Amino acid sequence: MARIFPMKKILFLFILIVLFYSSEAQILNDSLEYRIRPDSARTGELYLSVHNFNYMRNYEYFNKIQDGYTLFGAQLEPQLVYYAHPRLALTAGVHFRKDFGGQGIYKSYPLFSVKYQHGNSTLVNGVLEGNTHHRMLDPIYDFEKKITEPVEYGTQFIINGRNLFLDAFINWKKMIYKPSPVQEQILGGLSAELNLIKNSSMSLSVPVQLTVFHQGGQIDIADDPLQTLVNSALGFKLKLPFSGWIKNLRTENYLISFNDLSFTDLQPYSKGYGWYLNAGFDTQKFGSLMGTLWKGNSFISSNGMPLYQSVSQHIVHAGYTEKHRKLFILRYSYQQKLLPNLYMDFRFEPLMDLGKPAGSRKIEFSNSSFLMYKQEFRLHKAKGK
């Protein structure tokens, strides 16, 4: 008990400090993004795009909600990119995932996409700019899908302007054919952020996020009832730049909701919510540090990180429920460009379940390291260039 109370005081003091001074609700994933877009300077030319993503993500979790495990491997994504028009790019390739210690290639995906761009707007059909590119919150859209579901197929509309980011997409997760023994699965999503103030002394924005997961269909022979699960988030982000070794202070806070719109009750809860409160700072050279406080009530998410949910996905305790969840997570991250086109990303995230009695609280943690290589090589030069 003597060790618990000082820890409680330290955590409580830290929360007060970072919430008062103001961080990014999640670790920035800029280095993980790789977008191929039409380019007027490359019209008529053929390129080979190479995207290599090496990952090690380890969960030292011992709770009843999310398993402890390690993902360790590499992904390779070679694609041919034809810049058919200043506003049009066509891509074709393949995605390979190799898990270290496993036999052969764990999984491969064909890659086809058509991308039309006009000004700040882009229409994508085929392989989406998915997972981390959606810029969604972990309770709604698990960051781990960058590894476990690296390829998404469907249609996507993106606006990336000075004061507005918008990503609206349909991810067709499971296609079925008559007569199918399983149901189709579709995920629709919206991720938007509107800048209200953006200058050298302050930036303030309002993010809105929404996912709708539907499982059903009319040509399946499964007896399972239809499911429609909705998650949404509304919040604000504030960043205050500095000129010293601390580059900026941040705060990002959300109210996240869950609603089960299914005709048949299959979930333990039909609706719920969670407060996702975050604060911290970025340094010039030493990475970023932030604190996250999660207070969930009957919260479920169709695609979110299991840790935040009130219903367990644990291999031993599946279905176990905790109506009220209260977590504190301390996040350290360091991103660095090592060479042209080569990036590294390191993360360490200890957490404590504040919903447990003081004497039984344990510090759990996750740690990750990523290495990314992103490059395009010209294979054919357009005539006259």
In which residue ranges do the predicted regions lie?
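Exposed, low-structure sequence patches enriched in small/polar residues
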Residues: 73, 93, 111, 161-169, ...
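Flexible, solvent-exposed loop segments that connect beta-strands
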Residues: 60-65, 138-139, 307-316
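Surface-exposed coil loops of outer-membrane beta-barrel proteins
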Residues: 122-193
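Short acidic/His/Gly/Ser-rich catalytic and metal-binding motifs that mark active-site loops
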Residues: 57, 132-136, 217
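Beta-barrel outer-membrane channel/assembly domains of diderm bacteria
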Residues: 24-105, 110-116, 366-375, 384
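Subset of outer-membrane beta-barrel
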Residues: 81-87, 95, 106-122, 131, ...
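Bacterial Sec-dependent N-terminal signal peptides
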Residues: 1-32, 157, 287, 367-385
